[in-house]
Structures are given as C-alpha cells and as structure tokens.
From Swiss-Prot:
The keyword S-adenosyl-L-methionine does not apply. This is Pentatricopeptide repeat-containing protein At1g71460, chloroplastic. Pfam families: PPR (PF01535), PPR_2 (PF13041), PPR_3 (PF13812). It is found in: Plastid, Chloroplast. NCBIfam families: PPR. It comes from Arabidopsis thaliana. GO terms for biological process: RNA modification. GO terms for molecular function: mRNA binding.
Amino acid sequence: MEVVSSLGIRDLPASLSVTTSLNHRPHRSDKDGAPAKSPIRPSRTRRPSTSPAKKPKPFRERDAFPSSLPLHSKNPYIIHRDIQIFARQNNLEVALTILDYLEQRGIPVNATTFSALLEACVRRKSLLHGKQVHVHIRINGLESNEFLRTKLVHMYTACGSVKDAQKVFDESTSSNVYSWNALLRGTVISGKKRYQDVLSTFTEMRELGVDLNVYSLSNVFKSFAGASALRQGLKTHALAIKNGLFNSVFLKTSLVDMYFKCGKVGLARRVFDEIVERDIVVWGAMIAGLAHNKRQWEALGLFRTMISEEKIYPNSVILTTILPVLGDVKALKLGKEVHAHVLKSKNYVEQPFVHSGLIDLYCKCGDMASGRRVFYGSKQRNAISWTALMSGYAANGRFDQALRSIVWMQQEGFRPDVVTIATVLPVCAELRAIKQGKEIHCYALKNLFLPNVSLVTSLMVMYSKCGVPEYPIRLFDRLEQRNVKAWTAMIDCYVENCDLRAGIEVFRLMLLSKHRPDSVTMGRVLTVCSDLKALKLGKELHGHILKKEFESIPFVSARIIKMYGKCGDLRSANFSFDAVAVKGSLTWTAIIEAYGCNELFRDAINCFEQMVSRGFTPNTFTFTAVLSICSQAGFVDEAYRFFNLMLRMYNLQPSEEHYSLVIELLNRCGRVEEAQRLAVMSSSSSLQT
C-alpha cells in the first residue's frame, strides 16, 4: 500500500523530504515523447511603441461605481444609515464603495458612521479595510475627533498593528483615559510577548496623571495573567484598593483570573469569597481557574453550589469548561444530567465546543456507545467533533479506529486542522506507525501548520516512541519559540530511549532558561529520579514542588511518594503520604508500591486493606500493584482473593497483566488446575473485547 493512500490525505510525498516533492514536478511529455514546453514562458524583449499615446478617458461615475449601488435615497442621513447597516452585516466592500461615492460627490460623513465601520473592521480583523476607513476619516477632517481616535487605536491593535495604533495615539494632543484604555486593551490582545509594553504604557499613564478606571486595571490584570507576572499583579491589586476601585465585580473577576493563571489558588479564592453579588461571569472564572490548576473535584463542587444554592444555570462558556472536568473525574452520572440540561435548553446542542465536549465526556468515562451516539446524532458535524471522536477512540485504546477516522473525516469533506493533527500524532506514536506519522508530518508542512509548538511537541513524542531519537532533537533545536511542553517532550524523548541522565541534563538546561517547570514536568523528572535512585535530586525537586504549591495535585504527590519508596527512604514516603490532605486512589497506590519496593510485602497488603476499609475505591493500577506484590511474596491465597474482589465487587475488567500475574503465581505454587481455569477465562474475555 502506498503511503499516500494509507491515510487518505491526498497529494502528500512519501517521506519527510518535502522540498523535492513540492517544488520539483516533471513536465508532461507530448505524444512524440518530446518534453513539453516549460510552464514558465521565456521573457520577450519589449519593443518601444511607435504609436502615439492614447488620451485617458474622462472620469464617468458609472465606470467607478456599480449601477446597482444600494442607495435608498440621496438624502445624506439615509445614506449614512445604509452604510451603518452594511457595517453591522460586516459587508465592508459595499460600505466602502458608498463612501467613495460620497467622497466624489463631496457629501460629508459623520463620526457615528465611521465608528460603525471601524467596529466592523475589528470583527473581521481586516487591517486593509481599516486603513481605508482611516483615510476617509482624514478626508472628512475628523481625525482630531477623540471618540474616533480611540476607535482607531482599538481597531489597529485588534487587527495586529500595534505600531499604527501607537502612531495614532501619539498624534493626539489631549489623550483621555478611553484612548489609553484602547491602547492597553489592544496591546493585551496582541499576545503574551507584549507584557512589558503594557507595563510601560501603564507606568506612563500614571506618571502623566491620567485618572485610572476599572477598565484600565482590568486590562493590566489580563496582561499579568498571560505573563504569570505575580509580583506586578500584587502591586496593581494594592493600587486598586488605594484608588477605591476594588468594589467593582468586573475588576475582581479579572483579578481572580490573574491569580489562577499565576498558580495562586488561595489568593483567587480569597478574592472570590469577598464578592457579595456574584454573577455568572465570576462563577465561570472561578470554575475555569480551578480546572486550569488541576483542581477538578473543587471545580465540580463549585459547579454544584452555583446551581443548587445560587440558582445560576451554566451558559455555553461554563459548559465548555465543566464538560472536560466531568470527563477527567469520570463523573458519568452528573455528566448525563448536564447533557439533559443541554438538550432541554436547545440553545447549546449544536454549538461546536459543547457538542465536542459531550463526545469527549462520554469517551473519557468509557461509554463509547453514548459518545458515538452524540456524534452521529448531530446534523452539523465538523472538524471539531471529528477530532473529539478521534480523541475518544485513542483514550479507550482503539488506536486503529482513531487513525482510520482521519480518512472518514475527509470523506465527509472536512480537512484536518492543527488540533486534529496534534490528536492523531500520539495515536501514530502508540501504534509505532512511523510511516503514517511521516505522512502527517508532510501534510502539516504543506499546509503551513509548522512551526506550531504544540504540533512540534507531538511530532517529537511520536518520533521518539517510534525509535528515531535524532528527529526530536532536530525538531527541538529548530524550534525558536520553546515553551514548557516542548522542554518536557524533550525530557520524555531521552527517557523513552533509556538515556535517563540526558533527560536530567535537559531539565537542568530548562531551569537555566526563562521557562519554569510545571506540575507535569516535575512529575516526569520525579519518575526519572525514581529510576536512577537519585534521592538528593528528588529531595531538591520536592522542595521546589512545595514552593510552587504543586503538592496538592494528586499525580504529583503520588510521584513524590513513589520516588522516596524506590530510593529506599520509606520514612519520607510515609511522611509525604500523611501530608496529603485529600487522598485518592493515586496516593494509596503509590504508598502500597513504596512498601513493595522495599520488600515489606505484608505491610503493603495491610495498607491495601486499610485503603478499602476507609472507603477508597481501588482502580486497575492499584490491583496491578497489589497482585504484583502478591506474586513476588508468594501470597497465592491473597492474590486469588484480590482478583475475585476486582471482578465481583468493583466490576473491573482484568487486563492481560492481571491474568498473567495470578496464573504465573498459581503455577508456581502447584495449583495447576486453577491456573488452567483462569487461562480459559483470560482467552474468553480477550475474545469478547
């Protein structure tokens, strides 16, 4: 099978060498076998014209303007109204044609009409049309109008031209707070890299004695949130209190968002608790912030409180936030209630992100049938819903179906976008399908998806899992704008190829760079410390985790316990376990494994019994750890009992590893008949799945 046809992505080369396949195309041959003429015609020498130059035609109105110019009247006020209608419809081409007509006739245009046109330019992100409107404002002598000047600043920044916005702003003789706010807002919208520009503009604003309002500070808080500038955020918080602006719910919402994005959950909660009259925007910011900081259960509790106590029902923004949270914690029952609310409201059913969120929820909860039902029940499927389905297949281990979905998606007429490609690449990694992975890489290059940090990160992981370590290094070296995920992926690449010390070196280089490790990076490096038995480095990481307040994240606390256990420091492992405020299956499994690593098998079994007696629900990983300990210690009766407990009490489907651990132990202990019976069960269950 050819590479091109394997995924259904057409016109793709078979290897990573895209330059040849995209730029070099052989010319067609004619019937006699002679090469066809080159598509690029040779330049001909242009002879000087001897004929006299033609006189330009006189200007005629019908040549410049279409005959069907949609004017209802020659009255200027009615024409202005028509332009505003076209602006609201984002039909800038027709609106600007009418403006040209008015200019030719010498009919002036008012500021309200220009304001509507500039707003349309912002909605369409059309810098070209915005500059044309700016020219007409100058022609009409309205450039000194402060209202329009503020609108122009906002238009230029929203369309990505901060330089032009600054130029318009500097030309103003008496800039008021509104034009300053427009400049601040536009600089914030233009991205994280403009944080210093926002800070310098804000400082200049204060030095000139401009009266700050809540919108000024809100824009500054948004900039600090994007750059995680906590120190500056705290100073601005104090300034807001000093200026008596902190009673605004709008400003407090921005502050909550900033503290969450800086990782300060406690400060965000304190600000939230101070708000007396909370609207849906504040609740949404709080739920999104908790979800962003991996506090899924807290986000879920707040979501319940919002509905049951405050009687505030979720909008599409909160639904888009809470659906992934429900999937992460496997809250299928509550997820179905939310789905019922979505169906009842009828406003959110066909919204792309809500629809894909429902698919993602069911798939994460292991209910693929319901996920597929939601997907195929929609009349307006798109690339977003297809990507959600692919992600669901991958999450449930159906990697072949996930890879085939990219073909089915194209058969329905949808082209894979950046998110789709980033979803499919991990599937190629799991299947070790380097051929399809290279094809997707070529597709990304051809469609100009690269350089995209998330996509490059996925490519790095795919190549490393496929056993090609030189490609991830090359991709990482060429990446100009690295982020924390790219550094973490590079660490994973070395770990995947069993070069653990190189992974630690990459981590050290990351610390020397401007990027600071997040909870995921810390978890990865803790695993490396466990495998290397590097207790000293593990303790240093533990200190860094405490400083950053990552220890409350379940998987991080579990990795700390496991690291101490594998390094033989059981005392620190127990201390770390006791320090976890809200324990779960991850932390209990980690302490069980810590006892097992130190050959304290009976203590590990007692720990498992204690976990069950306290009402905690063991998962498949917990049973893997317990059965492995029983196998090492030769506890055959306990292993058989735990295996039955897994099946009958917790309704967990045993994996091949669970079966093999118990079967091997039974054979070792001479209980051959029971082992054979279990082997038959194993084969029948594998046939059913």
